[in-house]
C-alpha cells in the first residue's frame, strides 16, 4: 500500500518516530546500555531442577571471592517474600522448594560479570530431587500431589449458554495442540538500580511494560513505601507480554540497597529464556454442531492451558481463551470447560494475543472441518456464520463494538493472489531458503484462511485507567505520561494528538517514569485507546482554558472559538490569531485520567459483560510445501484488519507486518521444547525465528469504521495481526498436503510421515 506524507504531523499522518533516527544509527540508549559511576554487577543463581526440595544453601565460598560485595537469599528479603501480577504466589527467591528449572535461589553483586559467575559457581545448594508434575491433565485429575500451597489448578471457568441439549445433523470435532512460544525480544532483561544516599529509597531504570505495577510489587518486597521507589523506563528492545511480570527488578534493587552502590543486572540470552514467562501451551478439544447449510447450532469445547509453576496472568489468559471459543461467529448454544493449571514446566503468562491465539487456532481448524463436512467453500462457510454488532456472544454479552467481519473477509479475498511458482524458480523462492536439496516436482501450493476477533483492554471488572498531563508554555507543549514505549509507537502518537487538538507543532514528552499517575500496562492492545484517551482529555482541557484566555483578551465568547490548522479562529466571525502568538508568555497545565466503561466478572456459568470492546481481522495464507523434505515457504499473506480509525498509517502497517511475522513463527518454527520439565532449546541457535528470508509478501487492507466508544475512534492494532495468521498458514499446509494437521508449529515430520 502507498503511504502519503501530509504537511503537519497530526492525526492521520505517518509521523516519524522521535526515537527512530537514533535507533537506526545505533545511538539509542537501551536499558542494557545504562551505566553508573562506582557500579556493581548483579547475577542470579538458578535451579537446575524443575522440582526439588532445598536441603541447604552454603554461601561461604562465594563470600570469600575477591570482588564479591553481596550475596543474598530469601532470608535477606526485608519485605514480602512473594510477588505476582494477579496472585502473589511467586517467591523472590526459592527457600524451601524450587518449582521450575531456572527458579532464582540467590543473587550476588560483584565488581565484574566474571566475578559474579565465579561467585554463583561457588554457592553450594543441596537438593532432594522430586518427581516433577509435567502433564496438565495430572494437575486436573489430582493424580499428582499439589506442587504449591494454592493447589495445582490456577483457575477453572465454565461457560453454559443457550440450550445445551441442542443437536444438529452435521458434527465435526478435533483436538488441537498449541506449542509454547517465546516472545523472543532482541533486548534481554536489564536494569540499573541507584540507592538513595540515606538508603531509604531507590531509583530503578528498567525495561518494562508497566512501571507502576512493577513499583507496587517491588515496594512490598523491599519493605519500602511506594513513594520511596521510583521507576524510570529504560530503552526497551521488544516486549510482547514478557515484561509484564517481574524478572530482575527486585533482585537488582535488593543488591543496590544492601551494598549502597549502583547495581546493574542483565540477562544473557539463555538466562532470558528462564527469566520470563512464555505463551501458554494448550490443548483444546472442540465439537461443532451445524445445519446442513453450515450454520453453527452449538459448540462444545474443553481447553487446558499449562500455566507452569506460578500463576502470573494465567487466570486472565484462560478467560480470554474460553470467551473467544466461538470466534467471530454467531453461536446460539455453547458448553465450554476451561482450566489453567500449575505444573513444573516453565511459567507462562502474557504474550501477544493473550489466550485468543490458542482459541483461534482451534475454532478456525473447526471451520475448515465444517466446510469439508458440508461441501461449502472455506470463505462462504465463514460468511454464513459471521457475528454482527448487536449480536449476543456465548457469555451473554451483546457485541457493541463496530464489527466489520464481512468486510474483513471480502476485502481479504479481493486482494490479488501471488503468481504461480515458475518451472525454474530461484533457489531462495523454494521451501527451505537455499533450496539446494529441493526438487520442484515435490513442491505443492496451498491456500488457507483464518478469521478472528480480539478483545481490547483489561476485562472482568478491572478498574482500567491511564493518566496524562499536558503543559502549554510559551507556545510549546510538553506531555507527561507513564506509558511504556516498547516499540508500539505511543511516543509518536501522543504528540500527534496534541498537535491536532492544540494547533501547536512544538510538542515534546517528559521522562517516562512513576512521577505521574499510572498508565497501566502496554498490553491488551490498550494504549492507543487508554493513554491516547488520557492525552486527548488533557489536551482538550488545556484547549478549553486557552480559549477562555483568548476570549477574555479579545472579547469573544470562548464557545465560538476553534482551531484551524495552527490558528485560533472565531467560528462565526472574522477573528483569527496564530496559536503561537496567543500562547506567548502563557502557561497552562492540566492532568486527565481516562477510564473506559466498566466491565464485570463472569459468573459460575461464564455469563457477564466481561470485555470492553473487540477488533476483527481476516488472513489468507499462500504456502509452498516440499512434500519430500517437509519444508514450508510462506509465499504471501493477505489481510484486512478492523482498525477503527487510522491515526498513523505507517505505524499501523508496521504493527500488522510485525504481528504476521510472529504468527508465522508459531505456525511453522517457533516452539520451546520442554521434556521432563527441562527446557531443551534455550537459545536462538535451537529456538528458530523467522528471518528476512522467511518473510512473505504482505498485502494489507486497513478497514476504517471508527468506533464511537473509542476516544478518537481508533482500535488497538497490536495483537489482532498475529492471531488468525497462524491457523491460516496451517490451513494452507493442510490444503497443500491433504494431511489432517491439528498442531502448531507444524514440524517437517508432520508433513513427511
Where does each model-flagged region fall?
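Flexible, low-hydrophobicity surface segments
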Residues: 1-150, 171, 258
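Glycine-rich loop/linker segments at domain edges
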Residues: 13, 18-25, 151-191, 281-365, ...
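Extended active-site and interfacial segments that coordinate phosphate-rich ligands
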Residues: 18-22, 121-130, 134, 209, ...
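C-terminal catalytic domains of large/alpha subunits in multi-subunit enzymes
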Residues: 74-75, 223-228, 257-263, 292, ...
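Helix-loop-helix junctions that connect adjacent transmembrane helices in secondary transporters/permeases
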Residues: 78, 141-222, 387-476, 496, ...
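Short acidic, glycine/serine/threonine-rich loops at helix termini
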Residues: 81-86, 119-122, 215-217, 240-246, ...
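Conserved catalytic cysteine-centered active-site region
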Residues: 94-97, 225-227, 231-233, 257-268, ...
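Thiamine diphosphate
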Residues: 237-260, 264-266, 490-497
